[in-house]
Amino acid sequence: MPAVLRTRSKESSIEQKPASRTRTRSRRGKRGRDDDDDDDDEESDDAYDEVGNDYDEYASRAKLATNRPFEIVAGLPASVELPNYNSSLTHPQSIKNSGVLYDSLVSSRRTWVQGEMFELYWRRPKKIVSESTPAATESPTSGTIPLIRDKMQKMCDCVMSGGPHTFKVRLFILKNDKIEQKWQDEQELKKKEKELKRKNDAEAKRLRMEERKRQQMQKKIAKEQKLQLQKENKAKQKLEQEALKLKRKEEMKKLKEQNKNKQGSPSSSMHDPRMIMNLNLMAQEDPKLNTLMETVAKGLANNSQLEEFKKFIEIAKKRSLEENPVNKRPSVTTTRPAPPSKAKDVAEDHRLNSITLVKSSKTAATEPEPKKADDENAEKQQSKEAKTTAESTQVDVKKEEEDVKEKGVKSEDTQKKEDNQVVPKRKRRKNAIKEDKDMQLTAFQQKYVQGAEIILEYLEFTHSRYYLPKKSVVEFLEDTDEIIISWIVIHNSKEIEKFKTKKIKAKLKADQKLNKEDAKPGSDVEKEVSFNPLFEADCPTPLYTPMTMKLSGIHKRFNQIIRNSVSPMEEVVKEMEKILQIGTRLSGYNLWYQLDGYDDEALSESLRFELNEWEHAMRSRRHKR
């Protein structure tokens, strides 16, 4: 339990029963409620200031502890050794009648509320009310409250547990000009980066669109070139076919003329059966003619042989005309079959040969006609193939044109969609949205995620606000959502601060002598911040007391702010180890919870009276609420 160290005074002359004292009651007049905090402040004053600041009574109590086995420390009977009630007290009172236990709890709570273990940030000045002082003089005092409120912003309300006590406290974030300026610079930088990113994205999008258009144009040009090439090939093929057709026609005309010149008699004479029979008879009689006929039939005859064979044909024609005039009908052969004979077989062979010969001669004489027919068939086939090829080419060209058109339409639609594209909203679950909203910090709180200074205020005593210990160890309990803060209170901190100031001034003077030109304006402040007097050899011995408190009811979204509001863990641990190494821990006192009914009657009465006053002040405060 923290105790306020006071000067112990002992006097030889003591009074067994001090004079009766009258204590001024707290004012219970009607007050205005212009501000809820002001009302709470005045009520909290009645509970703590009026009783707790009466140090004259502590001095009077010290007189009552003369020649007693205990001393008066912070208005309470205490000793370094453990109390021995049986040997020291003749008529020991009960714990309830002594009032030490209850008054010690009030004193301990007052010590916490008055921030003996915290660094003071602000304290409201007391109002001095008198008949000569007009009411208008209170305006400057009342004006300081809004000024203080403008310098900080509420973070949250929570419950603080310290020792055996539980307090309702309020945490504030102290405004810092450096952090505000840094935040503003970061926001401007983010804005510039965002604007630059937007421009880069727009430029990249424009380049992509241009590249896409260029590729589409290249594809379109390639398609057009392909179609033009196909058209040119088609026209070229058509011209080649027409030229080939004309060439063949000219060749056919030449062949016809040649055949007309070569062919003397009509082709119908070659089919005269009488002439063929006469020719076969002539071949039977003339072996030379038979050989010539065979040569002509095989197609091995030359021009002279053909001319000679034509002469034999003319002779056979003349004989047929003489034997078979126009008015005479040809003789009809008997249909009765005759027995086969060798001569007949020979005659049949000659007849077949003659027929073959006639066919060969007919083929030779009328050669241009089948060639012409073959050429016409070939031309028809080629024209059909050309037509089919042209039709298929035309169909392919039409398909390609349709594909190009469809791709153009699709690309235009895609381009329009990209231009008018709307980013679809993500569908998120309601629980996730609610959790995200709960975890969101305000714009002001986001500025102080790093390096915030937390201010603490007791709701039951709003006249003062204190710094949360900067050099402390913060531990987060995930199971109970509680925060444990541990730090070391140095009781002779003023002495150490004086030593620090003296050392800094000495170092600055030495540095100015050595480096006058290199001196910078902000170097003094940096040295003052970085300098730690505890690590100096001649540092005063720190008198310390370790402290621990627990905060509960803080939303986890503020954990990051609280974690980063204290100094780094390595630095804090290093300083704590140094304090434990060179410092002296203050020993605690043992309270005497029982007093003697006769020897300590006045002390017991004083403790009970103070306890009643405190209870009355708390009761009136609850009643007004």
Swiss-Prot record:
Family assignment from sequence similarity: Belongs to the SWC3 family.
Protein purpose: Component of the SWR1 complex which mediates the ATP-dependent exchange of histone H2A for the H2A variant HZT1 leading to transcriptional regulation of selected genes by chromatin remodeling. Involved in chromosome stability.
Further information: Present with 1380 molecules/cell in log phase SD medium.
Transmembrane segments: none
Keywords from the UniProt entry: Activator, Chromatin regulator, Nucleus, Transcription, Transcription regulation
Gene field: SWC3
Region Disordered, residue ranges: 1-53, 194-234, 254-273, 324-434
Basic and acidic residues: compositionally biased ranges: 194-214, 221-234, 342-352, 368-388, 396-420
Assembly and interaction partners: Component of the SWR1 chromatin remodeling complex composed of at least ACT1, ARP4, RVB1, RVB2, ARP6, YAF9, VPS71, VPS72, SWC3, SWC4, SWC5, SWC7 and SWR1, and perhaps BDF1.
Example of a GO biological process term: endoplasmic reticulum organization
Subcellular location: Nucleus
Pfam families, per the entry: Swc3 (PF24707)
Compositional bias per record (Basic residues), positions renumbered to this chain: 20-31
Family annotation (InterPro entries): Swc3
Annotated PANTHER family: SWR1-COMPLEX PROTEIN 3
A cellular component annotation (GO) from this entry: Swr1 complex
Protein name: SWR1-complex protein 3
Top-level taxon of the source organism: Eukaryota
S-S bonds: none
Compositionally biased residues, Acidic residues: 35-53
Start-end of Polar residues biased regions: 261-270, 353-364
GO molecular function, one term: ATP-dependent H2AZ histone chaperone activity
